[in-house]
């Protein structure tokens, strides 16, 4: 059970600690501070990263994708101060060395929580629960909002899956519930990430050894494997692949599938327009940069929907792989509280 304390004005407060202040950790903080009213009762109570505090402050203030922070950012007495709000900064590679007895939830954003020993360091330090910002076999459960949130039953280590799975799973759940999915294939056209080099360099995956900004790079994605965990009723029915492209932000899922029923394009688009929540939609002829900073998990491009009389269906969705996912981290924190 999370330890919730009473705020001075009588509201319950959930104290959240961000471990790892990289792309997702910083985006989580930016999203929260831009609109804290969306997540009432959450307090960002601390940040930990192995980088120097000065670098943490600099990278938060000046962001190459989302632009500079419009308010004031400073370092004061070992804390990051944003528009007068002070957040303690820590610098350790081993989270279990900290005293987190007053923390309700650790957002594990280092990208390294692949083993149980690493994933539970926040618990060892005294925190109530851990939310991992990526796939992890060490998690007690993998949850995607809009797909399987009912799987949350008090588990202490929760994986928020991946940005691509958060885009794919709600679409697959809606389509399967309405028309039945026989089989399908999803390709994510994904912007480059920090896992790729800026110049050719050795890597375990040969295509990913090539300069990220110079080529389209066919590679793998964990989305199909994670979809099997999130929606076991579709286990083995969906294959997935990725193409990394020279774009800094916003990706898309191109989902082709065979359905049991025979929906029309209008029926499919009407269903996506009506659902709301983590699924957005657009009728406009947009390109990727137009979807930057959209908070939804996926935004359906209705003009791209295609259907054949034989049951072949194609749906296409945009997603800001950093901003949308960071919003889901905060939404999931609310669920866990």
Regions found by a protein language model. Give the residues of each.
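Flexible, active-site-adjacent loop/turn segments at secondary-structure boundaries
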Residues: 57-60, 64, 93-98, 141-143, ...
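Active-site-lining helix/loop region of Rossmann-like oxidoreductase modules
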Residues: 15-19, 23-30, 74, 173-276
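Short, conserved micro-motifs enriched in small and acidic residues
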Residues: 158, 162, 166, 214, ...
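Generic structural signal for residues in well-ordered beta-strands
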Residues: 87-89, 238, 315
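Short, Lys/Arg-enriched N-terminal segments with co-localized hydrophobic residues
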Residues: 1-13
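N-terminal Rossmann-like NAD(P) cofactor-binding subdomain of oxidoreductases
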Residues: 10-209, 331
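C-terminal active-site/capping subdomain that shapes the small-molecule cofactor and substrate pocket
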Residues: 240, 252, 256-337
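Structured loop/turn residues at secondary-structure junctions
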Residues: 110-111, 163, 219, 260, ...
């Amino acid at each position: 059970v999370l330890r919730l304390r009473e705020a001075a004005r009588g509201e319950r407060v959930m104290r959240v600690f961000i471990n790892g202040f990289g792309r997702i950790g910083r985006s989580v903080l930016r999203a929260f501070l831009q609109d804290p009213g969306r997540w009432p009762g959450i307090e960002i109570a601390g940040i930990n990263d192995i980088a120097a505090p000065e670098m943490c402050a600099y990278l938060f203030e000046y962001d190459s994708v989302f632009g500079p922070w419009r308010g004031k950012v400073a370092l004061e007495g070992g804390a990051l101060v944003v528009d007068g709000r002070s957040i303690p900064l820590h610098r350790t590679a081993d989270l279990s060395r900290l005293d987190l007895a007053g923390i309700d939830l650790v957002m594990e954003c280092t990208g390294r929580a692949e083993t149980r020993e690493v994933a539970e360091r926040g618990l060892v330090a005294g925190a109530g629960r851990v939310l991992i910002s990526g796939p992890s076999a060490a998690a007690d459960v993998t949850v995607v909002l809009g797909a399987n949130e009912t799987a949350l039953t008090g588990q202490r280590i929760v994986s928020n899956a991946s940005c691509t799975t958060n885009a794919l799973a709600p679409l697959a759940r809606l389509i399967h519930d309405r028309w039945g999915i026989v089989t399908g294939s999803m390709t994510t056209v994904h912007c480059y990430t920090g896992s790729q080099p800026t110049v050719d360099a050795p890597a375990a995956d040969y295509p990913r050894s090539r300069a990220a900004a110079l080529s389209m790079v066919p590679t793998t994605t964990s989305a199909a494997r994670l979809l099997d965990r999130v929606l076991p009723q579709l286990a083995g029915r969906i294959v997935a692949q990725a193409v990394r492209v020279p774009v800094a932000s916003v990706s898309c899922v191109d989902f082709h599938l065979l359905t049991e029923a025979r929906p029309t394009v209008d029926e499919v688009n009407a269903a996506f327009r009506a659902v709301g929540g983590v699924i957005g939609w657009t009728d406009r002829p947009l390109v990727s940069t137009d979807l930057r900073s959209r908070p939804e998990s996926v935004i359906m491009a209705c003009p791209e929907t295609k259907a054949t009389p034989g049951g072949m269906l194609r749906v296409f969705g945009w997603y800001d792989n950093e901003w949308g996912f960071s919003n889901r981290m905060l939404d999931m924190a609310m669920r866990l509280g």
